[in-house]
Amino acid sequence: MAKAKNEVPAVANPDDKLKALEAARLQIEKQFGQGSLMKLGNNSAIGNIEIIPSGSILLDEALGIGGYPRGRIIEIFGPESSGKTTIALHAVAEAQKQGGIAAFIDAEHALDPQYAKALGVNIDELWVSQPDTGEQALEIAESLVRSGAVDVIVIDSVAALTPQAEIAGEMGDSHMGLQARLMSQALRKLTAIIGKSNCMIIFINQIRMKIGVMFGSPETTTGGNALKFYASVRLDVRKIETLGKDDDEAWGNKIRVKVVKNKVAPPFRKVEMEILFGKGVCPYGSLLDSAVKQEIIGKSGSWYSYGDDKIGQGRPNAVKFLEENIDIAQKIEKELREKLFPGRPFVSSFVEKTKEQKEAQEKAVEALKKEEGSKEDALTGNKDETDDSAQKNSAASKAKRAEVVGLPADDSLF
């Protein structure tokens, strides 16, 4: 009986199996190129994941590997004004500190250059695009990734990636699933080249409510389900409370970040951070809390000590000490990262702020104060600031600010 044309021969001998596998590998590499098939242990790009720090040692710890993985897709989602763009801009600043090139695709047309500068972003070296359509935004992202020169790309946001057909149509026209199909097609093209170029793409996304959900969470993200599958890390950012809202002025938000998906480390870790208006996440408070947790900084009563030296009584004074002594902060950070992430190369997140960054912070804070003041005037009419009780509330607010966040009670740093 003749053998079938497509019959696969059975190989029983182990040596013959290895020879057959080697012949198959050579044939695959001849057809598809060098490196198309390899053993996992021989691929250093897969075994050793490079990272970009998040700008907060607490968030780096929650991510499990010391930061965001390069060559992967990251999704940051949450309600409005929860700190999504702030977290993404901190990642951009950290990439630039390592000598990387960053791009920001501003689909919402809402990027504030002064605020980005206040967070440490070098806006002179930041590539920015404000596309008109979703197709244009994703094609720009693909071109940047294919160049192999860009380290991180931020797309703000998925909800603003409007398909061309929707823009060309009339107001009120139904475009069922159009954006989801656009995202699915784009991610299929992007996911392979992202890994080869070692570029990281951060998608900022909004949440919506599903109608008719009786059980479980009614929340979902925009753009369909494709991004949920292709993302290696998904961060759920929520605002817990507004700091200072019970006093005369709000000066920050306390947020909770939950790693709801993580393909490079265990997921579902949570971290709480304070975001200061006009300044972003305070890294020194995060460093102090993490170092105390890992017993690198000792805490006895209200006193904090590093080695044999006391660095401050109370959290505000300890944070102020670290901010004024960046060399000690860098030394503590190095010890902390070596303990949490052994084998990872160390690049400090703490650098002396330039004069331009300090001025940008002051401008951002003043702009926020004016904005809050105009809103208050519109709601309450003429505002009286001569009342003694208002002055007492102001003093109490500053004292509370110093206690919670770790800044001095005066206005020198706010």
Swiss-Prot record:
Residues 361-414 are annotated as: Disordered. GO terms for biological process: DNA recombination; DNA repair; SOS response. It is found in: Cytoplasm. ATP binds at G78, P79, E80, S81, S82, G83, K84, T85. One of its GO terms (cellular component) is cytosol. Residues 361-384 have a biased composition (Basic and acidic residues). GO terms for molecular function: ATP binding; ATP hydrolysis activity; ATP-dependent DNA damage sensor activity; damaged DNA binding; single-stranded DNA binding. Its main location: cytoplasm. Can catalyze the hydrolysis of ATP in the presence of single-stranded DNA, the ATP-dependent uptake of single-stranded DNA by duplex DNA, and the ATP-dependent hybridization of homologous single-stranded DNAs. It interacts with LexA causing its activation and leading to its autocatalytic cleavage. This is Protein RecA. It comes from Treponema denticola (strain ATCC 35405 / DSM 14222 / CIP 103919 / JCM 8153 / KCTC 15104). The gene is recA.
